[in-house]
Amino acid sequence: MATIATMPVPETRANHTIYINNLNEKIKKDELKKSLYAIFSQFGQILDILVSRIMKMRGQAFVIFKEVTSATNALRSMQGFPFYDKPMRIQYAKTDSDIIAKMKGTYVERDRKREKRKPKSQETPAAKKAVQGGAAAPVVGAVQPVPGMPPMPQAPRIMHHMPGQPPYMPPPGMIPPPGLAPGQIPPGAMPPQQLMPGQMPPAQPLSENPPNHILFLTNLPEETNELMLSMLFNQFPGFKEVRLVPGRHDIAFVEFDNEVQAGAARDALQGFKITQNNAMKISFAKK
């Protein structure tokens, strides 16, 4: 893997928000947000995901968690995770995001701070336009977030299904973060079959139904959609399609070319936690 030339990242205090860079710049904004939500929601409740359309901010994103512990677990577990063929670089954001600052009662209007800090004589027409539009002007060559987080409109965490499927992206846990041996559980992560308090009991034995090229998924969270499931299953050979059940968010079917390929995907993703409290249950569909 090629070495990425970058300055050492200074230690930053724990924050509700994690800053991610070295993301694939070819991925569209909506698809990137959807993919980030799919892999980070297992660590805790996500308040927002910020991805800028500004060219200088391409390849960067912010994921805002409700709890600091969720952000910490996500940072430790997903550091270096191969996301769209590029290892993610993750650190805590240097300042609280607007949504967290408002929760703490420490929010300060960003435009006022900029006006006090920067003399009018130094403002260029482009900078004035950026301030009037509510967007912070990007700093050339900067990789750290703009103080206070870049102002971007909040968007729903779950986007509409987009045509096509993203490239190979293994789910969390299949490729260990740097420094962990294969099969070793990263800090903050849970073994697939380990249950949280209040969770449903383990799934019935996998041999309940005879092998089938179609898998039956249960215990899916409300926000599950076709794209999210396709991201998890399309890495396995023989994947054909995901079929959702109208009016039921908690179940779905995934079809493969043959029973062997379906069984391999079932064994690999059995118990995968799509969210913190929803461990996916997979069985062969009834013939």
Swiss-Prot record:
Residues 125-134 have a biased composition (Low complexity). Residues 106-134 are annotated as: Disordered. One of its GO terms (molecular function) is U1 snRNP binding. It comes from the Eukaryota. It is found in: Nucleus. The keyword DNA damage does not apply. The modification N6-acetyllysine is found at residue 66. Keywords: Acetylation, Methylation, mRNA processing, mRNA splicing, Nucleus, Repeat, Ribonucleoprotein, RNA-binding, Spliceosome. Residues 16-95, 213-287 form the RRM domain. SUPFAM superfamilies: RNA-binding domain, RBD (SSF54928). One of its GO terms (cellular component) is nucleoplasm. Signal peptide: none annotated. One of its GO terms (biological process) is mRNA processing. InterPro entries: Nucleotide-bd_a/b_plait_sf (IPR012677), RBD_domain_sf (IPR035979), RRM_dom (IPR000504), U1A_RRM1 (IPR034407), U1A_RRM2 (IPR034409). The keyword Ribonucleoprotein applies. The modification Omega-N-methylarginine is found at residue 157. Belongs to the RRM U1 A/B'' family. U1 snRNP is composed of the 7 core Sm proteins SNRPB, SNRPD1, SNRPD2, SNRPD3, SNRPE, SNRPF and SNRPG that assemble in a heptameric protein ring on the Sm site of the small nuclear RNA to form the core snRNP, and at least three U1 snRNP-specific proteins SNRNP70/U1-70K, SNRPA/U1-A and SNRPC/U1-C. Interacts with SFPQ; component of a snRNP-free complex with SFPQ. Interacts with IVNS1ABP (via BACK domain); the interaction is indirect. Component of the spliceosomal U1 snRNP, which is essential for recognition of the pre-mRNA 5' splice-site and the subsequent assembly of the spliceosome. U1 snRNP is the first snRNP to interact with pre-mRNA. This interaction is required for the subsequent binding of U2 snRNP and the U4/U6/U5 tri-snRNP. SNRPA binds stem loop II of U1 snRNA. In a snRNP-free form (SF-A) may be involved in coupled pre-mRNA splicing and polyadenylation process. May bind preferentially to the 5'-UGCAC-3' motif on RNAs. This is U1 small nuclear ribonucleoprotein A. It comes from Mus musculus. The lineage of its organism: Eukaryota, Metazoa, Chordata, Craniata, Vertebrata.
